[in-house]
Amino acid sequence: MLDIQFIREHADVVKESQRKRGESVELVDEVLRSDEVRRSSLKEFEAARAQQKEIGKKVAAAPADEKAKLIAATKELSQKVSEYKAAADAAAEEYTTAMWKLSNIVEPEAPEGGEDDYVVVKKVGQIRDFAAEGFEPKDHLTLGRGVAGIDMERGVKVGGSRFYFLRGQVARMQIAMLTMAVDQAEEHGFTLAITPTLVRPEVMRGTGFLNSHADEIYRLREPDDQYLVGTSEVALAGMHENEILNLENGPLRYCGWSSCYRREAGAAGKDTSGIIRVHQFDKVEMFVYAKQEDSYKEHEHLLAMEQEMLGKVEVPYRIIDTAAGDLGSSAARKFDCEAWVPTQGRYRELTSTSNCTEYQARRLNIRERMEDGNTRAVSTLNGTLATTRWLVAILENHQQKDGSIEIPKAMRPYMGGKEVIEPTKWEA
């Protein structure tokens, strides 16, 4: 949610942000109109209520000949107060509905355009020349099957399309990768949290995921009425809902480990083979609560953390600055790290990090106490540190001619010192 005072004073900035996102500019005018109606309706109600109280005080002390008139006036005014109250409540509801539709204000530096209008910030790592090495690279699913590590067929049998089993050394590789990510996060001052994967509607709405991505989210209907999270960002944002934080000693940094669930409603025909786009996966997510003035520095820190982790798994990658039209409603700016996938001949997203400024905090009522005793909204940021999809890039970029997988050096201590995953026949 945005600051209404900012919208009143800088409507042109908010409209420009909406335009860059490809969203309704007229919504800003709707917010301002409903805000004016809300304030005037509330003023009428409060004036009538004050008059009602004043007359009520006079009734007890009034002479008998005036008391009847005052009582009649009180009854008449009571009806008006009820009408003004109903009008004020309706105006407040209309205002709130409009406000919650507005997306966060895009940072001026974010590129204009849509999904394909990102800007490449830099590329890191050398892309392998498999032709020079004398063999055609296999895709991650073929490799995973070859080491008895990825079983899509039985996953589909059990859970339906886009489900899978990770087994043996590939399952160990995922645990190793996620554990390595947690260790790195803790070294940088993050606190590990195993988070809920079911959240209340108010928390899901507060983080902004029910705006344009509601169809991507699994929902449990009544009597539960809860949502399955697609990232631990949701639970970590909701953890301090309705709280006043102390950020005088620096940002609060969390590292969430959870299973995640996504419907992939708009993914028909996309990535139907393998584990790039699935309904369930595991992820380590960074989440930060920071002072408003520190959010940009923290965003750079999260991106550096992601790069450090990508360096450990030794895959070529690039960083892109996501265009405004491809940002989620909560993000003011977002950077993606995309790894090279040899068999696809292109980069695929492995991580993203977003600065959500005060947008989520206002919706969830998360504030900090200032030196003067007043409170203000904090900034929230998030970034992926490792997730199941990383296995795709690791398997393909570290494959050997015989179908074995060389384990990245940094991961070997997490896999008992093992250096290579050898081809293995399925035992069952």
Swiss-Prot record:
Homodimer. The tRNA molecule binds across the dimer. It catalyses: tRNA(Ser) + L-serine + ATP = L-seryl-tRNA(Ser) + AMP + diphosphate + H(+); tRNA(Sec) + L-serine + ATP = L-seryl-tRNA(Sec) + AMP + diphosphate + H(+). SUPFAM superfamilies: Class II aaRS and biotin synthetases, tRNA-binding arm. L-serine binds at residues 231-233, 285, 384. It is an enzyme of class 6 (ligase). ATP binds at residues 262-264, 278, 349-352. One of its GO terms (molecular function) is serine-tRNA ligase activity. This is Serine--tRNA ligase. Pathway: Aminoacyl-tRNA biosynthesis; selenocysteinyl-tRNA(Sec) biosynthesis; L-seryl-tRNA(Sec) from L-serine and tRNA(Sec): step 1/1. Consists of two distinct domains, a catalytic core and a N-terminal extension that is involved in tRNA binding. Signal peptide: none annotated. Belongs to the class-II aminoacyl-tRNA synthetase family. Type-1 seryl-tRNA synthetase subfamily. Catalyzes the attachment of serine to tRNA(Ser). Is also able to aminoacylate tRNA(Sec) with serine, to form the misacylated tRNA L-seryl-tRNA(Sec), which will be further converted into selenocysteinyl-tRNA(Sec). It comes from Bifidobacterium adolescentis (strain ATCC 15703 / DSM 20083 / NCTC 11814 / E194a). One of its GO terms (biological process) is selenocysteine biosynthetic process. Its EC number is 6.1.1.11. Keywords: Aminoacyl-tRNA synthetase, ATP-binding, Cytoplasm, Ligase, Nucleotide-binding, Protein biosynthesis. Pfam families: Seryl_tRNA_N, tRNA-synt_2b. It is found in: Cytoplasm. InterPro entries: aa-tRNA-synt_IIb, aa-tRNA-synth_II, aa-tRNA-synth_II/BPL/LPL, Ser-tRNA-ligase_type_1, Ser-tRNA-synth_1_N, SerRS_1_N_sf, SerRS_core, tRNA-bd_arm.
